[in-house]
Every structure is written in C-alpha cells, then in structure tokens.
From Swiss-Prot:
Compositionally biased intervals (Basic and acidic residues): 268-282, 289-299
PANTHER family (UniProt xref): 12S RRNA N4-METHYLCYTIDINE METHYLTRANSFERASE (PTHR11265:SF0), S-ADENOSYL-METHYLTRANSFERASE MRAW (PTHR11265)
Lineage summary: Bacteria, Thermotogati, Thermotogota, Thermotogae, Thermotogales
UniProt keyword annotation of Transferase present: yes
EC annotation from Swiss-Prot or TrEMBL: 2.1.1.199
Compartmental location: Cytoplasm
One GO cellular component term noted in the UniProt record for this chain: cytoplasm
Function: Specifically methylates the N4 position of cytidine in position 1402 (C1402) of 16S rRNA.
Organism name: Thermotoga sp. (strain RQ2)
Protein name: Ribosomal RNA small subunit methyltransferase H
Length: 299
C-alpha cells in the first residue's frame, strides 16, 4: 500500500451516533466504511454492537482493518459495493440489520494518497476509480467519449450550468489528457478569467466531481441501494446518510419521502456545527438525513 500519513476525520460523528442509536446485540451495516472512522466511533460508544463494514476501495479497507483490529471480534469488513449489500447479508446469514450508515464523501486517503487522480492540487494519473478493479478510468472517459456526452456529464453531474459545453470542447481540443493537471488546464482555458476569480472553490471542482461521479456510477448505485435499504432494516432500525452535494442529497430526500416503510427523522438536513467546521473544513458541505423503519407497508 502506498505511503499515507494524513489522518481522516470522520464527519458528524456525534450526530451519526445520535440518530443511529446503536445498542448491544444490534448489527450496524456501514456501507462506506472507508478508513473506519465512523465504525470505530460506533464500536467505542456501544461495547456490545456489531459492525459489518463494506467498501469497494481495497486500499482504504486495509487502513480500516488496522484501525479496527482491536474490535476484530465485532467488526467484519468486506470488499464489495453497497449496491450488493443485500447479497452479502444473505451470504452471511444475516436476515436484517438494525442500522445502516452511508458516508458518501471521498476519503482523505483517496484525496491525499498518491496516484488516485481525485485531486486537482498536483499531477497524478487520471484515474478517479474508487474500485481499482473497475476498467473505467477518468482518462478513458475524457479521451474517448464524444464532446456532447462530456458536456452532458459536466452539466448534470458537476452542475456546471453555464460552461459545460465550453469545458467539453476544450477537453476534446486538448486530447490526449493523461494527468489531473491536463484536465485542470482544459478547464482553465474554457472558463473566462472573471469566472475563475469569482468562484469560491477551485475552478475545476465541478468538472472533477462530474467525472468522478460518472466513473464510479455514484448516483445510479445510490438510487439502487436506497430502493432496497428499507427492506434490509428491522422494524425500529435506522438509516443515516451523509451526502456532500445537492445531487446526492436530493436522491436521499426523495427516496425517504416516497417510502411507505420509513419515518423521516430529519425534516431538514442536519449540518455540521461551526466548531466541527473549524476543526475539519471538509465537513462544511456535509448534510445528514435519517429515517426509521416502521411496520407499515409490510415486507
């Protein structure tokens, strides 16, 4: 595994525990175990509960295994997409769980680890895969998709409403793109200088988000899992989802609202406290929604 020294700080840990309400003998499914921060906090808070942690990223799973090794009798980790969580639970002989946690953010390791391609801060290969066994990379997408399709992806997934076509055109003109800085250059050339100055975040943030979402099928996977999630919960079991942009949050909100088997616990998304944002600026865009499984609607 590559060198990595920066500590990942899990977002809204207090709120996660408050809404999940983990108890002894209960099973929590951590769908995005990442580096294990939330799972560790839950296991420390609740000495008798059990964690089933899953992630598609084999490298962060190794970090999680190290972080959770003292809880190895209560924490089981698996490399699998949360999209297939129902299959995993069936294989384990677990009919239903008592809590589901999803933290949809990119981990510090993915951002700061070498050669993952998620960052625009330094030169890396254009990868952006969370599952390193997947064949679709950002480089493949950027160099092979038609300009119109790239524009659609940047418009829809990056919410780049005004400049998606210009960015797509510059990407095509700059082909082949091989590194993250090649993509940054194309975006810089596409945007007017006043627009670059006006943006509060890095000017390439939206484009990187769009390509990452497309490469990893993030929205499709989220929709597919949330449709099944209510049937994986015992009555009284809770699902907690932390999202980091409006596309994800909208999917979570609408799924909870349309469900006949879930009672919404958060009418509005819960945001991190000012104190947490000061300590962990990446938490700023986090939005937490929670719901509880009810008997109504049947199985």
């Amino acid at each position: 595994m590559r060198k990595y020294s920066q500590r990942h700080i899990p977002v809204m840990v207090r709120e996660v525990i408050e809404f999940l309400k983990p108890e002894d003998e209960k099973i929590i499914l951590d769908c995005t175990v990442g580096e294990g921060g939330h799972s560790r906090a839950i296991l420390e808070h609740c000495p008798g509960c059990r964690i089933i942690g899953i992630d598609v990223d084999s490298e962060v799973l190794r970090i999680a295994e190290e972080k959770l090794k003292e809880f190895s009798d209560r924490a089981s980790l698996f490399k699998i997409s949360y999209r297939e969580a129902d299959f995993l639970l069936k294989t384990l002989g677990v009919e239903k769980v008592d809590g589901i946690l999803m933290d949809l953010g990119v981990s510090t390791y993915q951002l700061k680890g070498e050669n993952r391609g998620f960052t625009f801060e330094r030169e890396e290969p254009l990868d952006m895969r969370m599952d390193l066994e997947s064949e679709v990379t950002a480089q493949k997408v950027l160099n092979e998709l038609p300009e119109e399709e790239l524009a659609r992806i940047i418009f829809e997934y990056g919410e780049e409403k005004k400049f998606a076509r210009r960015i797509a055109r510059k990407i095509v003109e700059n082909r082949p793109l091989n590194t993250t800085l090649d993509l940054v250059k194309a975006v810089r050339e596409a945007l007017p200088s006043y627009e670059i100055r006006r943006r509060k975040r890095h000017f390439a943030t939206k484009t990187f988000q769009a390509i990452r979402i497309y490469v990893n099928r993030e929205l499709e996977n989220l929709k597919e899992f949330l449709r099944k999630a209510e049937d994986l919960l015992n009555p009284g079991g809770r699902i907690v989802v932390i999202s980091f942009h409006s596309l994800e949050d909208r999917i979570v909100k609408e799924t909870f609202r349309n469900s006949k088997k879930l009672r919404i616990l958060t009418e509005k998304p819960v945001r991190p406290s000012e104190e947490e944002i000061r300590e962990n600026p990446r938490a700023r865009s986090g939005r937490l929604r929670a719901a509880e499984r009810i008997e109504k609607g049947g199985d």
